[in-house]
Amino acid sequence: MILDATPIITSLLDTDAYKLHMQQAVYHHYSDIPVVAEFRCRSDERLGEYATTLRHQVDMMADLSLTNEEFGYLQSLPFFKNDYLQWFKHFRFKPEQVHIATTADNQLTIKITGPWREVILWEVPLLALVSEIVHRARSPQITADDAVIQLRKLIDIFYRDAAEQQIDLADFKLMDFGTRRRFSYDVQRAIVDELKNHFPYLIGTSNYHFAERMQLAPVGTQAHEWFQAHQQISPELANSQRAALQSWLDEYPDQLGIALTDCITMDAFLRDFDMPFASRYQGLRHDSGDPIEWGEKAIAHYEKLGIDPMSKVLVFSDSLDFQKALVLYKHFHKRIRLIFGIGTRLTCNIPNITPLNIVIKLVECNGKPVAKLSDSPGKTICEDDEFVDKLRKAFDVPLVRQAC
């Protein structure tokens, strides 16, 4: 087998912004904590045949390092402290942390082990690699132009629907969340460039590389792993979500204040999200469950606490496309501020192409299991039934069908 000597990932910054934001917090607070993360394919795909190509690409990532220009760019941002940046300047990927194998039925398995401060950066480029390797092999005829043509059609429909429903788009805000399951690097670059130049409602991208290259705002706060890890960091399981929320404020007291709500369901989150947290965090992010029901709960919670919802923001990011975003915008507009993060349906929305439904999630921290009890049962991650039961009881979460 002849392997392509050209690396797909060519920049440390070709990742989601929240990975660097979380990495800095981990570096400062939990530097030596060991974790394990694992790959999941949520569909019936047989991806084992791509293991050798993936291994080759992962090995080439050992050569990546921050350029002087990238270092200067990160220094110019208000989020990062100098001690972290000096450490990150010398950061190198360690391919030996990534264990890639194939099962008897041709499933791809990926397991990442090591210190959290290092493992944290593997998820996004690994998923982008799997996606691009598979799509290159299956659909070599597809170009970035195909994706841009489709995007223009979707935007035309978006404008037409908004006009027909007399929706004022003045407050519509879009963010690109498309790195991890993009068709390819070239497609994401073309899509973000098209949006920047022709869609006035784009406010930023979650990808630091494209943010730097295209002078866009980098966007992102924290992911499920932040809350999951605290399940085995916090001395008391029932207090772990509050510990995660507080630790984030300790690192970022007055910025990056969007909290993710569905690591242990929205209802359990809101029980912990009391006045001190609700007043300090700028808003909430939706990533599973019914988005309208979720948004109504968020607004009601703010109102119950005496907080004006229009002083807060809801970020919707669960399987969004332009049509879903417009429905949500119409429903919540002028009741609370809104931002829409669209990912796969921006960067892998091409006729006759099926995006991969793949994730990499934390499964262990400090040698013990962690779990995610999503608002969508199919997105629940569990490795240990006994721990899931403990977590459910600690947070008073009803038993739901698990997807392990």
From Swiss-Prot:
Posttranslational modification: Transiently phosphorylated on a His residue during the reaction cycle. Phosphorylation strongly increases the affinity for substrates and increases the rate of nicotinate D-ribonucleotide production. Dephosphorylation regenerates the low-affinity form of the enzyme, leading to product release.
GO annotation terms (biological process): NAD biosynthetic process via the salvage pathway
PTM sites of type Phosphohistidine: 224
Catalytic activity: nicotinate + 5-phospho-alpha-D-ribose 1-diphosphate + ATP + H2O = nicotinate beta-D-ribonucleotide + ADP + phosphate + diphosphate
CDD domains (UniProt xref): PncB_like
InterPro entries per UniProt: N/Namide_PRibTrfase, NAPRTase_N, Nic_PRibTrfase, Nic_PRibTrfase-Fam, Nicotinate_pribotase-like_C
UniProt key word Ligase: yes
Keyword Secreted among UniProt keywords: no
E.C. number(s) listed in UniProt: 6.3.4.21
Domain of life: Bacteria
Keywords assigned: Ligase, Phosphoprotein, Pyridine nucleotide biosynthesis
Gene Ontology MF terms in the entry: nicotinate phosphoribosyltransferase activity
Gene Ontology cellular component terms for the protein in this record: cytosol
Pathway(s) it belongs to: Cofactor biosynthesis; NAD(+) biosynthesis; nicotinate D-ribonucleotide from nicotinate: step 1/1
Entry function: Catalyzes the synthesis of beta-nicotinate D-ribonucleotide from nicotinate and 5-phospho-D-ribose 1-phosphate at the expense of ATP.
Similarity-based family: Belongs to the NAPRTase family.
Protein name according to UniProt: Nicotinate phosphoribosyltransferase
Protein encoded by which gene: pncB
